[in-house]
A protein has these predicted regions:
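Accessory terminal helices/loops
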Residues: 2-39, 203-214, 221-303
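Conserved beta-strand hairpin/beta-sheet module of binuclear metal-dependent hydrolase folds
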Residues: 33-92, 164-178
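Active-site HxH/HxHxD metal-binding segment of metal-dependent hydrolases
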Residues: 56, 71, 78-153, 167, ...
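Active-site metal-binding loops of divalent metal-dependent hydrolases
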Residues: 76-77, 101, 127, 157-158, ...
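Active-site-adjacent loop/tail segments of enzyme domains
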Residues: 186-212
Length: 303
């Protein structure tokens, strides 16, 4: 609803109104704490990822090639936080990986370009992305230092949504940055697409990645998603266990990201639309697209 209202405003006014809305929403949720989660890091031999919480529930990610110290930032909606992390880690930020055009993901791009003082390549799959200077499409490839990046086109939440699949030089360390397509235990709303498109994104593309691929999503929605997953599959013990794990993490103000592709296949109803237990919930046994449509519609109004 709020996005429809803002879309009727002139571009500059729309951006200002959207920024004010998300800032106010963040203050309402987080108060004087400032942020919804503590910062955290995932460090491997070739790749480091610094998890940078932003706004009321967003995540930005600073990706570092440990061999070259070249870095990229995913969805830098809070440029000051990004620059502070870059300076703290002493890395060479070269690129911005934008998953989609929504303000809470791409709204900081132009300010980051202005503040940073060095040229940055801004990747993305949608001309509506602020600061975009390198448009990408499905299967496009580039590098972050020695790390290999492959673009996965996942239209549905938005028509130009891109996920970024990253591998170490040897291919043994793998991660995917999924924006608002795939969440821990859930998926994004179908704002600009269809159930067929989300099925293609989740089942035909992302689920085909190696099971040990780490999944870094765009929001801290885990407990709400898992609660819904338990509603869909009340006998799913993997979901129940993940709920308890997530409660412990959130009680400590820690992020629940990353998950893995293997985990999502066990706990995420939107990744399980080919499973009979999920199809039965939707009264659509043998029909995964109808199941996807139904469980998304119910989730949109689930409390």
């Amino acid at each position: 609803m709020i996005s429809r209202v803002f879309s009727t405003l002139p571009n500059r006014a729309s951006k200002s109104a959207t920024a004010a809305y998300f800032t106010y929403k963040s203050w309402l949720q987080n108060g004087w704490r400032g942020c919804h989660s503590n910062q955290a890091s995932v460090t491997m031999s070739d790749i480091s990822v610094h998890i940078l919480p932003a706004l009321s529930d967003n995540y930005m990610y600073l990706i570092i090639c440990n061999q070259t110290k070249e870095a990229a930032i995913v969805d830098p909606v809070k440029p000051d936080t990004v620059i502070e992390a870059v300076n703290k880690e002493g890395v060479n930020l070269k690129s911005v990986l934008t998953t989609h055009h929504h303000w809470d993901h791409a709204g900081g791009n132009e300010q980051l370009l202005s503040l940073f003082g060095k040229p940055l390549t801004v990747y993305g799959g949608d001309d509506r992305i602020g600061g975009l200077n390198k448009k990408v499409k499905h299967d496009d490839e580039f590098t972050i230092g020695n790390l290999k990046v492959k673009c996965i086109f996942t239209p549905c939440h938005t028509t130009g949504h891109i996920c970024y699949y990253i591998q170490s030089p040897a291919g043994d360390q793998k991660m995917v940055f999924t924006g608002d397509t795939l969440f821990l235990g859930g998926c994004g709303r179908f704002f600009e697409g269809t159930a067929d498109q989300m099925y293609s994104a989740l089942i035909e593309k992302l689920s085909k990645l190696p099971d040990d691929t780490q999944v870094f999503c765009g929001h801290e929605y885990s407990l709400g998603n898992l609660k819904y997953g338990n509603h869909v599959e009340p006998d799913n013990q993997d979901i129940l266990a993940k709920i308890e794990w997530s409660k412990t993490k959130r009680d400590a103000n820690e992020p629940t990201v990353p998950s893995t592709i293997a985990e999502e296949k066990l706990i995420n109803p939107f990744m399980r639309v080919n499973c009979e237990s999920v199809q039965k919930f939707a009264n659509a046994v043998g029909h995964p697209i109808e199941t996807m449509t139904y469980i998304r519609r119910i989730k949109d109004n689930f409390k």
